[in-house]
């Protein structure tokens, strides 16, 4: 039987704030973890993407601050990325609205002196990246003699980014804390071992029901597709998919920063409103691009690495495209989890080469009862690139290209239909008059199958 926030020990004042944020009832992870948190137990929480993990620790922390003296010892929350830190800070700020709590974020890419000034206001809640926190400790600009709570979010990503040593260094610099809790959307064995060690074998909260909730939601709200392509066909397929889909918001995931920049330029040249996001971008650019994408009313594309694959909440994402196939199950779930949120239907499309097919299908079978559909069922029409469909001396005109593609069949991997970029290259070598003599018609597309 589901519990209410009141039954979990949350005050009416805070419940009213939650209701104003359209948080009317606790998720399963919140139902189980909040009472344990309020009892000051050390916790190890496994909570997949989209199950309300951030609010699961933000709500009880704010509840305790409202009941206790607000000059009490501070809470420190550590997260692996700047974007996730800002997202967590926003969650705290929204839930603590009009409660006069001081909440600050400490991240790289922002002048340290500005953050030192904020530290001097004696904030009750500090959210930061490990790198900036350790930097400020070395400068002696901040100290943690005592903490109320220490929260480590997405601990597996922290370890993946090489912060194991820093985690233990941080613990050595904290004289005492009432409570420590570790949260993550996924745990490998190393993450489990570290979590047990730093929480002194804290209470583990995780259940197949949480995964079931997430996966059932995905099955109902998110349509999954796979497109089997050669690597050199992906750009044209991406452009065609975006133009055919005609949706407002799309996230395109890539496996390298260089590829993000490359696709950003490619889509911009083809007159698509696109923004790029990765770790090498300056902080103000990252914040600006994410803010524009989150609040835009125009069709917009965000090309990114896994930087926002987890923890970043942008509502009503219509489509996720894995331009680089994701062969890690947890990462795939996290990417897919950017869409299908708050009962908003979404689509997840993965571009997959023949070499990746077997591994990808085996991976996806673990989270869906149905075989993943192929892109040909989406009726994607191949559309010529705008930036290449220009008349060149001895080349091909836009009109001629439009004739070739006017009635192109949906992409069919079994027949290995050449995509527009390949066909265009082959035609570029032929003068337009010669093509007219050959009487190229729509069925010329079929002859290339």
Swiss-Prot record:
Chain ranges of the Helicase ATP-binding domain: 34-205
GO biological process entries: response to cold
Enzyme Commission number: 3.6.4.13
Claim: Nucleotide-binding is one of the keywords in the record: yes
Disordered: annotated span: 427-449
Domain Helicase C-terminal positions: 233-383
Superkingdom in the source lineage: Bacteria
Motif placement: Q motif: 3-31
Reaction it catalyzes: ATP + H2O = ADP + phosphate + H(+)
Protein name per the record: Probable ATP-dependent RNA helicase MG425
Organism: Mycoplasma genitalium (strain ATCC 33530 / DSM 19775 / NCTC 10195 / G37) (Mycoplasmoides genitalium)
């Amino acid at each position: 039987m589901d519990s209410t926030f009141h039954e979990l020990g949350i005050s009416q004042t805070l419940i009213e704030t939650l209701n104003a944020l359209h948080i009317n009832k606790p998720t399963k992870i919140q139902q189980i973890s909040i009472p344990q948190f309020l009892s000051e137990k050390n916790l190890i929480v496994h909570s997949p993407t989209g199950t309300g993990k951030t609010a699961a620790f933000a709500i009880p922390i704010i509840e305790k601050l409202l009941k206790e003296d607000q000059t009490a010892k501070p809470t420190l929350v550590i997260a692996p990325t700047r974007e996730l830190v800002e997202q967590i800070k926003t969650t705290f700020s929204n839930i603590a609205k009009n409660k006069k709590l001081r909440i600050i974020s400490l991240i790289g890419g922002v002048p340290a002196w500005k953050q030192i000034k904020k530290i001097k206001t004696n904030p009750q809640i500090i959210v930061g990246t490990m790198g900036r926190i350790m930097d400020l400790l070395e400068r002696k600009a901040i100290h943690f003699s005592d903490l109320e709570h220490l929260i480590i979010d997405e601990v597996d990503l922290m370890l993946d980014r090489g912060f194991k040593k820093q985690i233990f260094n941080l613990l050595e610099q904290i004289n005492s804390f009432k409570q420590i809790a570790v949260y993550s959307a996924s745990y490998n064995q190393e993450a489990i071992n570290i979590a047990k060690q730093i929480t002194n074998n804290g209470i583990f909260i995780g259940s197949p029901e949480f995964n079931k909730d997430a996966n059932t939601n995905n099955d109902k709200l998110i349509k999954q597709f796979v497109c089997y392509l050669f690597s050199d066909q992906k750009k044209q397929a991406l452009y065609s998919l975006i133009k055919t889909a005609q949706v407002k918001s799309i996230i395109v995931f890539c496996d390298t920063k260089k590829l993000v920049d490359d696709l950003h330029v490619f889509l911009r040249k083809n007159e698509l409103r696109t923004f790029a996001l990765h770790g090498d971008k300056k902080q103000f650019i990252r914040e600006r691009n994410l803010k524009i994408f989150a609040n835009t009313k125009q069709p917009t594309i965000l090309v990114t690495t896994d930087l926002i694959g987890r923890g970043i909440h942008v509502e009503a994402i219509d489509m996720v495209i894995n331009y680089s196939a994701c062969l890690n199950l947890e990462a795939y779930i996290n990417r897919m989890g950017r869409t299908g949120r708050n009962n908003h239907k979404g689509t997840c499309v993965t571009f997959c080469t023949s070499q990746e097919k077997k591994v990808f299908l085996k991976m996806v079978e673990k989270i869906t009862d149905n075989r993943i559909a192929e892109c040909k069922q989406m009726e994607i029409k191949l559309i010529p690139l705008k930036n290449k469909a220009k008349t060149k001396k001895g080349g091909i005109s836009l009109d001629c290209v439009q004739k070739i593609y006017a009635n192109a069949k949906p992409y069919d991997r079994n027949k290995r239909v050449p995509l527009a970029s390949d066909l265009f290259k082959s035609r570029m070598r032929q003068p337009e008059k010669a093509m007219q003599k050959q009487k190229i018609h729509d069925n010329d597309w079929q002859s290339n199958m």
